[in-house]
Amino acid sequence: HPAAVVRSRGTHFETVPYGDALSPGSEYNLESLLSDLRHVIRTVNPTQVIAPVPFDQHPDHAATAELVDRALAGTSCHPQRLGYLIHTSRIPTALVNTPARALLPPLRMRTYSWETYTLSPAVQQKKTKLLMVYRSQRPYVFLLRNAFVRRNELFFIPQEPATLATTLPPAAPVSR
């Protein structure tokens, strides 16, 4: 329910307790989150927005994609929406470091629109360092680094965010 207030597992608050936040004191609910996202989008007026794809198999990533798409739909801003895919059984995970190999779309998803951006070796090194910053993710990041630090970035180009979830394969739950 969009108006339902949730309690933070970390702070145990139901409202934003930080005075320097965008909306101090606002309730933790969907409408407040969308309002803040729309405010940031209107303020920044981005030409591109990069967020997870809605068919990512990790529920947090799929939910983030939906939130971003809902926020964009509620503004007059029309940036290019690019999506990145992390969790799917259709992307091969390299167990050895293969930065010279290209990151390609999963075979069953190659008919969708994808865009690649070439990364220099220096940018690949910087990306590896940034991935290793997330201590809570380190057991996973080591394998992901090998799978995702490649010679290019790969982005999904959605046709229309509002209909995206109905035109793509459903997300399957991720086992942890």
Task: Label each residue range with its predicted role.
Residues 95-139:
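A conserved mid-domain beta-alpha-beta active-site/ligand-binding segment of alpha/beta enzyme cores
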Residues 140-144:
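Surface-exposed patches in mature extracellular/periplasmic domains of secreted proteins
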Residues 83-90, 121-123, 151-154, 167:
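Low-complexity, flexible helical/coil segments
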Residues 1-78, 125, 145-155, 161, ...:
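Active-site beta-strand->loop->alpha-helix modules in alpha/beta enzyme cores, enriched
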Residues 54-57, 86-90, 136-137:
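Short, solvent-exposed loop/turn segments at secondary-structure junctions
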Residues 75-97:
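Short, flexible loop segments at boundaries between secondary-structure elements
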